[in-house]
Amino acid sequence: KGVIFSCIAAIFWGLPQPLFFNELNHVETIEVVAHRGFWSFIFLFLLLILISNISDFIEIFKSRKRIFILTITAFLIAGNWAGFIYSVGQERVQDASMGYFITPMISIVLGYFFLNEKITKPKFASVCLMLSGILFLFINLNQFPFLIIWIGTSWAIYGLLRKQVNVNPS
């Protein structure tokens, strides 16, 4: 069931976004990211007031470490959005796709080094195969794959840091 819902979410989330952001290619990336952040904040704040426990929200701000990590993750996700929106606006959707494609590989490596997660033989084989394919693609590019690396790395580091912070989902 989870795989089916994951595929449905990917279709509804992944397909419309490049089409939507392509229509905004005349607007500066930073402005689109600022609007996305601002309106997300407004929407989530209203949602918090309507259906959540305010004390859980206030609890987040009782730890400096938690605030620090959440601030870093906010900048990482904003930078990731900027990379995605910029790549779509520059008609480099494949760079964005490749960035998100390499994210699991980067996440596995980060988990191994920072979370002491074990890499099973199948995971190791898949990382090696993916790495060889990516290196082949990178070698054949005419330019340094900055956007690909930025999108994949910023998303993976965001995931790693968010895993370090316990925030009540209510």
Residue map of PLM features:
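Specific transmembrane alpha-helical segments of multi-pass solute transporters/efflux pumps
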Residues: 57-94, 136
